[in-house]
Amino acid sequence: MSDTLLNPYFGEFGGMYVPEILVPVLKQLEETFVAAQNDPLFQAEFTDLLKNYAGRPTALTLCRNLTKGSKTKLYLKREDLLHGGAHKTNQVLGQALLAKRMGKTRIIAETGAGQHGVATALACAMLDLPCVIYMGAKDVERQSPNVFRMRLMGAEVIPVQKGSCSLKDACCEAMRDWAANYETTHYLIGTAAGPHPFPTMVREFQKMIGEETKRQILEKENRLPDAVIAAVGGGSNAIGMFAGFIEEKSVQLIGVEPAGKGIETGEHGAPLKHGTTGIYFGMKSPIMQTKDGQIEESYSISAGLDFPSVGPQHAYLNASGRADYVSITDKEALDAFQALAQHEGIIPALESSHALAYALKLIAQNPDKEQLLVVNLSGRGDKDIFTVDKILNGGN
């Protein structure tokens, strides 16, 4: 793979492990991406859409009540305020513009929580591109508001009945579709994972999260935060936040994986800390797999974190020690979900609630420590209210 324009690896992780038929397609995508990055007209169109369609920059909000009794200042980067309800819209607009530039006439995508599906559907509606979304049947059931939104915007939503009927199965079906229809179709991957150039491309189309946060925190506090905290499934919201701070060695980068029902139960989605390196979804990265290499089922209350692998740059940041990765259980995430709603009037996505829960844990452990924390509130929780209601009122 020495003939790629960009390095396809992050340390030992990443690469382009795809059927031979897709290699030229990925190379075309990489060439188009590199050209677009250097094209002021492309950048101007992307920036204009982010500002006037998606609503950037998003706010950096100080929590006024959650930190009472402590010396911590906690800020939330409000990606929940972005059009579409989550950070997903950022990079979807970038990839959709690339697809048009390549002359593709059809977009496919996978989605777990439905947020990436919604973002893809809205971008395709606005740019007049047909759109097919693959979604695990289990997720179709638990994310019905987002399924309706996608269909309302003209997307075809295909429930995937195979395997565990979750995000990993939706990814496999989308990859199959792409291999069969690559000449006309762009596969708009929803996270910073998959074969090269997707992890690099998605990071570049999400990095404004960290860049804005850095500018905003310096403006408000006149210093950098002690830590930035983000939930990690595939890893796009976290890499978008981390990208602004990787070079700032004084800032701790904390990624939060889902511990589900508890790491010891095996029902979790924490491959970075509890998986082994393997090949999956076109990349080399940590995976939840059995000793004979079968992909294990991941689990999280949050559909968007229910993924058995993780983006290769996170694997590298973990291996190199630059970022720290921790895990939060369903229960801790639910408690944080309720706490933010009750004390700040903000309903976070269950994905983002994992990051918030870890911040609250840090505050509780060190109430007398003066610390400045930023949580990436990657999405809003409207999509999760039925799931949470069911659990709190005696459901699962």
UniProtKB/Swiss-Prot annotation:
<dbReference type="Pfam" id="PF00291">
    <property type="entry name" value="PALP"/>
</dbReference>
<keyword id="KW-0028">Amino-acid biosynthesis</keyword>
<comment type="similarity">
    <text>Belongs to the TrpB family.</text>
</comment>
<dbReference type="InterPro" id="IPR006654">
    <property type="entry name" value="Trp_synth_beta"/>
</dbReference>
<keyword id="KW-0057">Aromatic amino acid biosynthesis</keyword>
<comment type="subunit">
    <text>Tetramer of two alpha and two beta chains.</text>
</comment>
<dbReference type="InterPro" id="IPR001926">
    <property type="entry name" value="TrpB-like_PALP"/>
</dbReference>
<keyword id="KW-0456">Lyase</keyword>
<feature type="modified residue" description="N6-(pyridoxal phosphate)lysine">
    <location>
        <position position="88"/>
    </location>
</feature>
<comment type="function">
    <text>The beta subunit is responsible for the synthesis of L-tryptophan from indole and L-serine.</text>
</comment>
<protein>
    <recommendedName>
        <fullName>Tryptophan synthase beta chain</fullName>
        <ecNumber>4.2.1.20</ecNumber>
    </recommendedName>
</protein>
<dbReference type="InterPro" id="IPR006653">
    <property type="entry name" value="Trp_synth_b_CS"/>
</dbReference>
<dbReference type="InterPro" id="IPR023026">
    <property type="entry name" value="Trp_synth_beta/beta-like"/>
</dbReference>
<dbReference type="InterPro" id="IPR036052">
    <property type="entry name" value="TrpB-like_PALP_sf"/>
</dbReference>
<comment type="pathway">
    <text>Amino-acid biosynthesis; L-tryptophan biosynthesis; L-tryptophan from chorismate: step 5/5.</text>
</comment>
<keyword id="KW-0822">Tryptophan biosynthesis</keyword>
<dbReference type="GO" id="GO:0005737">
    <property type="term" value="C:cytoplasm"/>
</dbReference>
<keyword id="KW-0663">Pyridoxal phosphate</keyword>
<dbReference type="GO" id="GO:0004834">
    <property type="term" value="F:tryptophan synthase activity"/>
</dbReference>
